[in-house]
Amino acid sequence: MNSEKISYPKQACACAVSLDLLGDKWSLLIIRDLFRGKSTYSEFLKQSQEGIATNILVDRLKKLLAMGIIDFRRASHDKKIKKYFLTDRGIDLYPVIYEFQRWTLKHVDFDYTDNTKNWNDLIQNTPQEEV
């Protein structure tokens, strides 16, 4: 576990810093996919309907690794395969992903995937804490 803080050289508000570090679509979708059980480059590339380009996937994985949000282990059956996982720092982003999804389901009319439908059904039956 990396408890050392991420260095950020500019003076800014916390919201601006977090958006600068994590606010791009692909980083958040990789984090979402890790929460959903995906763990390999191939799974991120082929099993996400958003269709991330290979160069962007490589870049974002490196960025998330450098920030200590994810890490990897080599697969036991094939040492060439990296199995990515969320670190404690990455797991701390769960409420962010959760609230983005909850906000979208509440305020945006869109055609959503089976994963989103299942997740929505689950949270409809989960008591919400007052913020």
Task: Give residue ranges: language-model regions.
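Residues within the helices of the helix-turn-helix
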Residues: 42, 62, 82
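Short, charged/polar surface micro-motifs in flexible loops or helix N-caps
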Residues: 36-38, 63, 90-91
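Canonical helix-turn-helix DNA-binding module
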Residues: 47-75, 79
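Amphipathic alpha-helical dimerization/coiled-coil segments
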Residues: 95-131
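Recognition helices and adjacent regulatory flanks at domain boundaries
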Residues: 1-13, 17, 21-25, 47, ...
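Basic, amphipathic "hinge/linker" alpha-helix immediately C-terminal to the N-terminal HTH DNA-binding motif
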Residues: 23, 76-99
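N-terminal helix-turn-helix DNA-binding core of bacterial DNA-binding proteins
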Residues: 13-56
